[in-house]
Amino acid sequence: MIQPQTRLKVADNTGAKEIMCIRVLGGSRVRYGRVGDIIVASVKEATPGGQVKKGDVVKAVIIRTAKEYGRPDGSHIRFDDNAAVLIGKENNPRGTRIFGPVARELREKQFMRIVSLAPEVL
């Protein structure tokens, strides 16, 4: 469950380390973001020489949440952290690598490029 002001780890090599959610996209009444949702965020921490700088406003897709969520088969899944991947035009990732596992729900939401770059899909 990601809402405005939530801080997330960045799980790619764009140079951003931490972002803060500004808005969950998808209508005026969307309060929380789940895995696969797109958010608008501000870069709060970045490495020098990266693609993005501190203060940049970026779009990102949520790939992991610490709050568990149910799947249609009755199982539940949760992760150790809240993490996102920065995306650009046409929802393609801005980085060339993704760190850590990603959820299977990203495949259903058509983020195939992120799924293919991920080391593990849970």
Swiss-Prot record:
Keyword Ribosomal protein found: yes
GO molecular function: large ribosomal subunit rRNA binding; structural constituent of ribosome
Similarity section: Belongs to the universal ribosomal protein uL14 family.
Name of the gene encoding the protein in the UniProt record: rplN
Name of protein: Large ribosomal subunit protein uL14
Lineage of the organism: Bacteria, Bacillati, Chloroflexota, Chloroflexia, Chloroflexales
Pfam family, one: Ribosomal_L14
Coiled-coil positions: none
Self-association state and partner proteins as the record states: Part of the 50S ribosomal subunit. Forms a cluster with proteins L3 and L19. In the 70S ribosome, L14 and L19 interact and together make contacts with the 16S rRNA in bridges B5 and B8.
Keyword tags: Ribonucleoprotein, Ribosomal protein, RNA-binding, rRNA-binding
Annotated PANTHER family: 50S/60S RIBOSOMAL PROTEIN L14/L23, LARGE RIBOSOMAL SUBUNIT PROTEIN UL14M
Function: Binds to 23S rRNA. Forms part of two intersubunit bridges in the 70S ribosome.
SMART domains: Ribosomal_L14
One of the GO biological process terms: translation
NCBIfam families in UniProt: rplN_bact
